[in-house]
Regions:
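Topological signature of polytopic alpha-helical transporters
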Residues: 1-6, 13-14, 33-38, 80, ...
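Helix-to-loop junction immediately C-terminal to a conserved catalytic motif
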Residues: 26
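Q-loop/switch helix immediately C-terminal to the Walker
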Residues: 60, 65-82, 93
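Conserved ABC ATPase signature
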Residues: 110-114
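Hydrophobic anchor residue at the start of the ABC signature
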Residues: 124-125, 152
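A short, proline-enriched helix->beta-strand linker immediately N-terminal to the Walker B motif
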Residues: 129-133
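Catalytic Walker B motif of ABC-type/P-loop ATPase nucleotide-binding domains
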Residues: 135-138
Length: 529
């Protein structure tokens, strides 16, 4: 049993199940037996109603390093606090939270410039915005030096008493465990061996040091687990202690007040989009790289392009294929790490009131701007450098604009594909490891290197490269161009049939692919755990 405003530490060796127990207690892990009660309310049964009064800080930081601390808290406050909260009230809450964690003087610094301990305090500040009564922290002192660890422990102990928070944390370090009100010691196999005051722990085990306690539990965990269960039975079960019956609906209503109200979808989308814009444009080095890529690629395409591009079949098909592949790589590189690198933050916000479709749509909106700039640089410079140009437009005022739109849709659809990959994996390394595989599929089923027949033709329907090349072949009228060797005919390719309706329909297919990729990304992310 954990009382109100208690500061509790769950300790034990690696693999003892500390985090598993905390996840079960917090209600974030449904795959458990038994029940957890919060003020007499079944937490698992009423988790959707109670989750807004629960703060949870995972081991990874849940903050964006490319935002200033105050800006990070402002965005989070707009997402977490009741929708009718005024800006003045949000600012007041942010200032109070900064004071709670001792970061007032760091409020206007970029989070990436904060120390490890300060970043952990910033993560705690993010959760404090919603004023939760129950707080869970997973390894908050991991990787901190002794002085920083002591400072953080003092902050947590102060929060539990002065701010009326019940704080439960998992930790390996015990130098300042005396600041806790209660310690839960877990032995191998997830067996609880002690639950009580920290100053009584060594006396309970009959040992003088933590190392001796670990050694004792490694060899006699069942005995100590049995002792704990017997004591628990004597203190609680033999006294017929029961969970008091409460009117859950009334109790929940009293506990959550206005915290359960959700921000409107449009407002949430606006906040997420504005935040993502700021993140992208604050990362100047990466943004420069994203815009430098199409510039360099356009120059390289000019270097390898022959003078008879748009005049001769071989040269035109090759350079259009290179242009399409360049667009695919640029789009994929834009987003393949965008979701997985934010996974801890996304998971925590989704446990709150974040709508996944607004999250993905905010990515689409910002990426549309980035893709627009990249397309303009790539196609604009490439077409200016070319000696010749396609001769006749079909849908737009000029064939150059038709090529621009095709490459824009190619880059954008590839960025949407990158979001799927990023949604499926847990870290950036795995995402980048999958990038070559995705690109190889685009190369094989583009219809340029190999003839598409049977299964290959069907697979090509889900590739960006096939539809991109179909558009470019249509615009440049490949079927009507001559081979380099005079008099040598080339086989007519139905993919490159010229026609305004054919071109428009192919553009629509690329647009539809973007929409489908967005839906798939949302579905994949619904399995966040």
């Amino acid at each position: 049993d954990i009382g109100n405003n208690e500061f509790v530490a769950i300790i034990g060796g690696s693999g003892a199940g500390k985090t598993t127990v905390m996840n079960a207690m917090s209600g974030f892990d449904y795959d458990i037996s038994g029940k957890v009660y919060c003020n007499g309310i079944d937490l698992r049964k009423n988790f959707q109603s109670l989750k807004n009064i629960i703060g949870f800080v995972p081991q990874q930081d849940i903050i964006y390093e490319n935002l200033k601390l105050r800006r990070m808290l402002e965005y989070t406050a707009q997402l977490k606090m009741p929708p009718d909260t005024t800006k003045g009230e949000r600012d007041e809450r942010i200032q109070k939270v900064l004071q709670m964690v001792g970061l007032e003087e760091r409020a206007n610094e970029y989070i990436r410039k904060l120390s490890g301990g300060q970043k952990k305090r910033a993560s705690i500040a993010v959760e404090l915005l919603a004023d939760p009564g129950l707080f869970f922290l997973d390894e908050p002192t991991s990787g901190l030096d002794p002085d920083t660890e002591k400072s953080l422990m003092n902050t947590l102990a102060k929060l539990s008493k002065t701010e009326n928070k019940t704080i439960i944390m998992v930790t390996h370090t015990v130098q300042n465990i005396n600041l806790c009100d209660k310690v839960i010691f877990m032995g191998p196999g997830g067996k609880i061996c002690y639950c009580g005051k920290p100053d009584k722990m060594y006396e309970y085990f009959g040992k003088d040091s933590l190392v001796d306690v670990y050694s004792e539990l490694a060899s006699n965990v069942d005995m100590w687990n049995m002792k704990y269960l017997m004591l628990y039975k004597e203190q609680h079960l033999d006294k017929n202690t029961e969970i008091p019956e409460v009117n859950e609906n009334e109790k929940i209503s009293d506990m959550i007040k206005d915290s359960g109200k959700k921000t409107s979808p449009l407002k949430q989308l606006g906040v997420l989009t504005k935040r993502y814009f700021e993140l992208v444009f604050n990362d100047r080095q990466r943004l420069l790289l994203l815009l430098l890529q199409p510039f360099i690629i356009a120059l390289l395409l000019k270097v390898v392009a022959k003078k008879d591009v748009f005049k001769i079949y071989d040269s035109t098909q090759s350079i259009m294929f290179a242009l399409a592949c360049s667009g695919i790589w640029i789009g994929l590189f834009n987003t393949i790490q965008e979701v997985c690198k934010e996974r801890p933050i996304l998971k925590r916000e989704y446990m709150g009131n974040l709508r996944l479709w607004t999250y993905i749509l905010s990515k689409y909106i910002v990426q549309a701007v980035v893709c627009f700039m990249q397309t303009t640089i790539l196609t604009g410079l490439f077409l200016v450098l070319m000696k010749h140009a396609p001769k006749k437009e079909q849908v737009l005022p000029t064939p150059q604009l038709e090529i621009w739109l095709t490459i824009f849709l190619t880059i954008y659809a590839s960025a949407a594909l990158g979001l799927i990959v990023s949604s499926c994996v847990r870290n950036s390394d795995r995402a980048m490891a999958l990038a070559p595989f995705v690109l190889i599929i685009q190369l094989l089923f583009s219809g340029v290197l190999f003839e598409l027949k049977g299964a290959a033709d069907k697979i090509s329907y889900i590739t960006v490269s096939r539809w991109s090349m179909e558009c470019l072949g249509n615009i440049t009228n490949l079927n009507k161009l001559n081979m380099k060797v005079t008099g040598m005919p080339h086989e007519h390719n139905d993919l490159y049939n010229r026609g305004a309706s054919h071109l428009t329909n192919t553009w629509l297919i690329l647009f539809l692919m973007m929409a489908v990729c967005g839906v798939i990304s949302v579905i994949v992310l619904r399995n966040l755990k």
